[in-house]
Amino acid sequence: MPPKFKRHLNDDDVTGSVKSERRNLLEDDSDEEEDFFLRGPSGPRFGPRNDKIKHVQNQVDEVIDVMQENITKVIERGERLDELQDKSESLSDNATAFSNRSKQLRRQMWWRGCKIKAIMALVAAILLLVIIILIVMKYRT
């Protein structure tokens, strides 16, 4: 931290200084300009301006609050978008798996239908062959 300047100096602080310096440092004169910088502006002179500053400061505080809320909302929205993207990717993967499984099942069902038709055709052919053999044997005897 920088050293703080003393308002009133002791004799030990000024030993070795020139008389003019000592007189300027130890004199207790305070003009208005020096007091302004040491104590700050006085209240009555800057009353209306001080109200304006407070008003502007309140507006700045409100803007800061709104910006912080907006940033929080953007962060939450980003998190929700990430979750939504993950769910969307999962749904896409599930849709692809469902499509592949449905194609496989369709093929299985088609082959099952073909097998049933082939068995029915074979049974019909055997029945027809039995009937023909019976008719032929009946006429031969």
From Swiss-Prot:
Segments crossing the lipid bilayer: 116-136
Topological domains, Vesicular: 137-141
Domain (v-SNARE coiled-coil homology) ranges: 52-112
Keywords: Coiled coil, Golgi apparatus, Membrane, Phosphoprotein, Transmembrane, Transmembrane helix
Residues carrying Phosphoserine: 17, 30
Record topology, Cytoplasmic segments: 1-115
Gene Ontology biological-process entries: cellular response to type II interferon; endocytic recycling; Golgi ribbon formation; Golgi to plasma membrane protein transport; neurotransmitter receptor transport, endosome to postsynaptic membrane; regulation of Golgi to plasma membrane protein transport; regulation of synaptic vesicle endocytosis; SNARE complex assembly
Compartments reported by the entry: Golgi apparatus, trans-Golgi network membrane
CDD domains: R-SNARE_VAMP4
Disordered as annotated region, ranges: 1-51
Any one Gene Ontology cellular component term annotated for this protein: cell surface
Superkingdom classification of source: Eukaryota
A Pfam family it matches: Synaptobrevin
Family: Belongs to the synaptobrevin family.
Subunit structure: Identified in a complex containing STX6, STX12, VAMP4 and VTI1A. Interacts with BAIAP3; this interaction is increased in the presence of calcium.
PANTHER family reported for this sequence: VESICLE-ASSOCIATED MEMBRANE PROTEIN 4
Protein name per its UniProtKB record: Vesicle-associated membrane protein 4
